[in-house]
Design a protein with these regions (language model features):
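Hydrophobic hinge/microswitch elements
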Residues: 127-132, 140-141, 147, 209-266
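Short helix-boundary/capping micro-motifs
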Residues: 10-28
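Secondary-structure junction motif
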Residues: 147, 176-178, 184-223, 287-291, ...
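A late-sequence structural motif
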Residues: 269-309
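A short LG(V/I)-centered, amphipathic sequence patch enriched
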Residues: 40-57
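Beta-alpha-beta core module
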Residues: 153-159, 164, 237-286
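Central regulatory/effector-binding core of bacterial HTH transcription factors
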Residues: 89-152
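Alpha-helical linker/hinge and terminal dimerization helices associated
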Residues: 42-43, 64-86, 298
Length: 309
């Protein structure tokens, strides 16, 4: 089987567009169409449904996608082993949660790009462990970074490379800030027994699937008394804007509100236990030398508190 057809297949599956796949592969769109038809004829199955919105994998196509990626991984490994003395080069795609993409990775990727000029590094938003699993399995990303307490997915290898501090924050003029009579030490963590006194407050949390927001929401809803009012958003910016306007409280990574705390637009009410930063890779997929190098650099940057960026 011509592996070029498999590469076209996986690229079209990832982009969902004949035009985008052709551009990425530096082929004419008609060539992509011909190659996909040739592969479908060879396998005697339909791999894609051609819809006005683009190319969508059929159930059979989705089932064969991971197998095709394994074949291409084996081809890449063969080429690498034939040129073991070659410099580290290639493309690495990092999947990461929103807060890491916005506040940790930009400077880190800039530093990596300076240190590894022959490696092209891309970032892609990944919202949950299940999404990370799908993207790692399909080859859309090579490595994922998530803020999660744990990830129990058998085909994913996980390691803790750092921790992200969390804080409960509010606007300076919020009634609960003004009601605080005992100043808190910066390192003092919340006593979960105190959550009952928060029940009458309004909270803005990140959408379901965010582990620390989910845990906090469960704790709030489990406390006696009136259930709190909880609104969930898919964006840290939306949460922060509502809190800055004095509409309620939020639990967020400290790094995402550091500038607001420094300028006194927000106040820290309680510190919470840190959430681990997990690095994930697919156990059965080949990890290129470029990806291995990027992973090693990310471990070091996280251990240094990201100051290396």
């Amino acid at each position: 089987m011509d592996t070029r057809l498999l590469r076209t297949f996986t690229t079209l599956a990832r982009t969902g567009s004949f035009t985008a796949a052709a551009a990425e592969l530096h082929l004419a769109q008609s060539t992509v169409t011909v190659q996909i038809r040739a592969l479908e004829k060879d396998l005697r199955v339909r791999l894609f449904d051609r819809l006005p919105s683009g190319a969508v994998l059929t159930d059979t196509g989705a089932r064969l996608l991971e197998r095709a990626q394994h074949v291409l991984d084996a081809e890449d490994r063969l080429h690498h082993e034939a040129h073991t003395a070659a410099p580290i080069e290639g493309s690495v795609t990092l999947g990461a949660s929103e807060s890491l993409c916005a506040y940790r990775l930009p400077l880190a990727v800039a530093a990596l790009s300076r240190d590894l000029p022959t490696v092209e590094i891309h970032m892609r938003a990944v919202g949950s462990p299940s999404e990370a699993s799908e993207q790692l399995s399909s080859g859309r990303v090579d490595v994922s970074l998530l803020l999660e307490s744990r990830v129990d997915i058998p085909h994913l290898e996980t390691e803790v490379i750092g921790h992200e501090p969390l804080a409960l924050v509010a606007a300076p003029g919020h009634s609960w800030v003004e009601a605080e009579t005992s100043p808190r030490h910066p390192g003092e963590q919340v006593d979960l027994g105190e959550l009952a006194e928060l029940n009458e407050q309004t909270f803005f949390l990140l959408e379901e699937g965010c582990c620390y927001s989910d845990d906090f929401a469960r704790q709030l809803l489990a406390t006696p008394g009136e259930p709190p009012r909880i609104t969930r958003f898919g964006s840290i910016e939306a949460v922060r804007a509502c809190v800055e306007a004095g509409l309620g409280l939020a639990l967020l990574p400290v790094v995402s509100v550091a500038a607001d705390l420094a300028s006194d637009r927000l106040r820290t009410l309680r510190n919470f236990p840190e959430v681990p930063i997990l690095m994930l890779r697919h156990r059965s997929r080949w990890t290129s030398p470029a990806a291995q190098t990027v992973m090693a650099r990310l471990r070091r940057l996280a251990a240094e508190g990201w100051v290396g960026g």
